[in-house]
Amino acid sequence: MRKINLASPVVKWVGGKRQLLERLMPLFPDTYTSYCEPFIGGGAVLFALQPENVIINDINSELIGVYQAIKDNVDALIKRLEQFENTKECFYDVRGWDRNAEFYNQLTDIDKAARVIFLNKTCYNGLYRVNSAGEFNTPFGRYKNPNIVNENTLRAVNEYLNTADVTILNTSYSEAVQGLPENSFVYLDPPYDPISVTASFTGYNAGGFNRQDQIALRDCCRQLDANGIKFMLSNSATEFIQDIYSDFNITIVPAKRAINSVGSKRGCVDEVVVRNYE
């Protein structure tokens, strides 16, 4: 399958791997027939690899709605995005759509997807964050000329999603990896174990992700391994993470934080890459 060069992340997402791709690419397996990414996020790894048989998933229904809209009706999505204005008034009006459940539920899938992209492009630091009620709560970013529509990227992603055999799911990671065929490869990029008490960010989903969840994910990886399926997982290089994955191959890689509310704190931190293959 021809690689679509312009296919790249449409939204900025916490933990995005665009800046880490150069270090990650040599660590992926050479051959596999099916690819699964249960925490798709912005999709930087997906678009770098562009495999032919793919399952992408995320628990965040709004994010998955973006992928589905791009795949199903990119023309309508572009037209809807062109109607938004980069003003404080428009931003807070659109952000407030989810405060009224009756109103929000009447929106089309295109409206909902366009809203996510618009808010992501115009909110402060591109930080997708929801409160405990699942309502988007990042403030206006005051950017002079954000690329709200980004038509070339949208059309390239649409082409990839319709050229490859792509299944889009909105479920738990554990459900997403069920029944994978032999010679599958799974890349897992979950919410990270916090490196400090104040470093935790799981606001991309109202439910959060704690250490019990990390252990459950480790158990899922053990099951993948027992089933003969190759996996690779990214996480922070905390002692806890290195301990629970000590049965597998661990590589330490330095990574730059792509999203932080304080610019001076966007420094380098160590991450782990866990694999069940050489």
Where are these regions (language model features)?
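SAM-dependent nucleic-acid methyltransferase catalytic core
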Residues: 2-19, 30, 73-187, 191-201, ...
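Conserved acidic-Pro-Pro-aromatic motif
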Residues: 182-273
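Short, polar loop motifs at secondary-structure junctions
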Residues: 39-44, 154, 235-239
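Conserved proline-anchored active-site loop of SAM-dependent methyltransferases
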Residues: 24, 35-49, 53-59, 117, ...
